[in-house]
């Protein structure tokens, strides 16, 4: 046994053969694609909101239908279904639902049909995110599992940029063709699963070091780590079914799940909930009111090249936000150490301050009305920090729970330990979605109140949109 040390994340002291590095690259690429494709349809739908519903219909209904079914999947699935996870069936089910949902949006013009299609794609996205987070826990040693999860988080961040860019490119084709073309994207996921993703059993004997161990004298050592799940044929009972046998009839009861989830509430769920509640209140309720006069080329040469009308401000804030979310969600995959466990609430605290500062800037303003350049730079910095906080909260919460050791009471039972780890990472997934849902309800009165505050001080830009 190699000695445990305090610096858990380093693998530099190990000489990893090229074959193992190639496996890690394939694992990272696979999980990056899972995160990218699973989330990109969500972004495409939000980006296409103006084109999907009549002008008289509140665009918030798109945001609601795009998040509520995903929340149902994240809340219900881990608690209701029992037994081992059949990842192949899950992945094919999500692929078909996503593609079908986008086809319904593309082929039908009625608002009701389009909302049904958006709901199908949303449910699939929520279940898909849950599935890939759980899939990451089936890899061992912990450094391998963390590698996959880090790249999955990076892929979800990239989806924001990719989705907005894709819709920008295809929106000229119209909803029927543009959204119809996006319905083929979900098929990348099963192709990745079968043709690119290494099996968890391929890491059974590798020289990749586990998180928590290091030795300057070990080079190319072969460590017998048994992954918590192997091939699909080796799995026990399926979700919702029970098979006979001393090893295969393990399933967590509802009381077991309640016991497991209690310590996760304050450690992971509340920080995730609040960071997303504040974040999406900013995006949907505050950012639309952060408007300034169009910069003059004489005073602000660079800004005048970017901002041509007051309608350009909101897309600019969203571009800044999506870019910084991608960078921060990629922090672990590019080698930045994760936050210490006791600092996991920090991003949500900072996000709350950012919300207050941006609301103050919108309603009262930090600077004089003719100093729009300073105001724009300040908002740029605050929204960049907003995206960083949101991305760090997401990737660090799921990374930390992915790396947790099994409960001592179940460590001797590999099957039970596997199911507990899958449930724990799946059970906290609803926290971010519920934060977004509550934010969508809070954003409408927030936007109206800030616009009224602006008009009271003579700033009428929000009335001109």
PLM features per residue range, with description:
Residues 1-41:
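Cytosolic juxtamembrane N-terminal segment immediately preceding the first transmembrane helix
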Residues 4-14, 200-269, 273:
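Long, low-complexity inter-transmembrane loops of multi-pass membrane transporters
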Residues 24, 28, 41-47, 53-57, ...:
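Membrane-interfacial loop- and helix-cap regions that link adjacent transmembrane helices
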Residues 44-47, 118-141, 164, 290, ...:
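Intracellular juxtamembrane helix-capping segments at the cytosolic ends
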Residues 63, 69, 140-193, 318-324, ...:
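Glycine-rich segments within core transmembrane alpha-helices of 12-TM secondary carriers
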Residues 72-109:
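Conserved MFS/SLC helix-loop-helix module at the cytosolic interface between two early adjacent transmembrane helices
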Residues 82-95, 173, 334-351:
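Cytoplasmic membrane-interface "Motif A"-like loop-to-helix N-cap segments
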Residues 86-91, 168-186, 420, 445-465:
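A membrane-interface helix-boundary motif in multi-pass transporters
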């Amino acid at each position: 046994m190699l000695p445990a040390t305090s610096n858990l994340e380093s693998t530099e002291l190990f000489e990893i053969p090229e074959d193992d590095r190639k496996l890690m690259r394939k694992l990272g690429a696979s999980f990056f694609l899972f995160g990218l494709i699973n989330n990109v349809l969500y972004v495409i739908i939000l980006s296409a909101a103006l084109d999907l519903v009549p002008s008289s219909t509140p665009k918030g209904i798109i945001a609601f239908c795009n998040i509520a079914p995903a929340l149902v999947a994240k809340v219900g699935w881990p608690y209701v279904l029992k037994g081992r996870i059949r990842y192949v069936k899950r992945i094919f089910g999500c692929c078909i639902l996503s593609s079908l949902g986008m086809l319904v949006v593309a082929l039908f013009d009625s608002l009701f049909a389009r909302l049904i299609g958006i709901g199908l794609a949303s449910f699939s996205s929520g279940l898909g995110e849950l599935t890939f987070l759980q899939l990451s826990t089936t890899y061992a040693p912990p450094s391998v599992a963390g590698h996959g999860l880090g790249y999955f988080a990076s892929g979800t961040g990239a989806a924001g940029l990719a989705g907005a860019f894709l819709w920008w490119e295809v929106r000229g084709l119209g909803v029927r063709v543009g959204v119809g073309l996006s319905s083929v994207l979900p098929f990348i996921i099963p192709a990745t699963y079968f043709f690119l993703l290494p099996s968890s059993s391929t890491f059974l004997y590798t020289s990749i070091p586990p998180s928590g161990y290091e030795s300057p004298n070990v080079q190319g050592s072969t460590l017998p780590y048994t992954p918590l799940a192997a091939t699909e044929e080796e799995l026990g009972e399926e979700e919702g079914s029970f098979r006979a046998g001393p090893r295969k009839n393990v399933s967590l009861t509802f009381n077991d799940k309640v016991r497991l989830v209690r310590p996760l509430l304050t450690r992971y769920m509340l920080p995730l909930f609040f960071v997303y509640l504040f974040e999406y209140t900013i995006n949907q309720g505050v950012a639309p009111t952060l408007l300034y006069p169009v910069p003059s080329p004489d005073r602000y040469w660079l800004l005048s090249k970017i901002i041509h009308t007051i309608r350009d401000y909101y897309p600019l804030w969203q571009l800044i936000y999506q870019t910084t979310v991608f960078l921060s969600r990629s922090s672990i995959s590019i080698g930045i150490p994760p936050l210490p466990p006791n600092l996991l609430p920090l991003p949500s605290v900072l996000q709350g301050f950012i919300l207050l500062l941006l609301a103050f800037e919108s309603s009262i303003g930090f600077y004089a009305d003719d100093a729009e350049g300073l105001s724009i730079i300040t908002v740029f910095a605050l929204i960049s920090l907003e995206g960083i906080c949101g991305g760090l909260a997401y990737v660090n919460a799921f990374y930390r729970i992915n790396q947790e050791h099994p409960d001592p009471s179940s460590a001797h039972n590999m099957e039970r330990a596997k199911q507990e780890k899958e449930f724990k990472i799946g059970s906290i997934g609803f926290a971010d979605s519920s934060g977004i849902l509550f934010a969508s309800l809070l954003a409408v009165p927030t936007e109206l109140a800030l616009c009224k505050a602006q008009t009271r001080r003579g700033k009428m830009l929000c009335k001109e949109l």
